[in-house]
Amino acid sequence: DIVKTAQVARVSFYRNFNSISDVVDYITDELANEFIDKILPVLNSNDENKWREFLFDFINNALNNRGKIEAINLQNTAVLFSHLNTKMQMYVNVNSNKTISDKYTSYVKACLINNVVKKWIDDGMVETPEEIINYLMSFITLF
């Protein structure tokens, strides 16, 4: 079921994956890499328009990949968002020589987005993307 829901062709599954776990890893890696590539340019920015554009793209990506995300959630895992947090640790430099703000602000913003969007997906995406963006921006603009 996860192979079908995640839109992976059966032939591709047998040719490229050894298990359902491999499919989940592939999907999470693909989505996490896309998130990282898009967030890095805005992470240290205070430009509200850039942040809104990023959030709009990220949330629309979540909507467009809903089948894949739901397939992962059907396996009762938070693999995607755990994977995103792990990848953030690789890219966001937490250097002890910096101020607390320098060390943690980028990571806090990324984790905020990950966890709010995860909750939104888990709750069935009831609110509009605009409502979620406005909610997230109310926090992002504080930093």
Predicted segments — roles?
Residues 15, 25-26, 134:
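DNA-binding alpha-helical recognition surfaces that contact promoter or target DNA
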Residues 32, 36, 40, 63, ...:
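Regular secondary-structure segments
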Residues 34-38, 65, 87-95, 143:
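A short secondary-structure junction motif
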Residues 40-68:
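Hydrophobic alpha-helical connector segments
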Residues 53, 74-111, 130:
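Amphipathic alpha-helical packing segments from all-alpha helical-bundle domains
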Residues 100-123, 127-142:
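Hydrophobic alpha-helical segments that form the core
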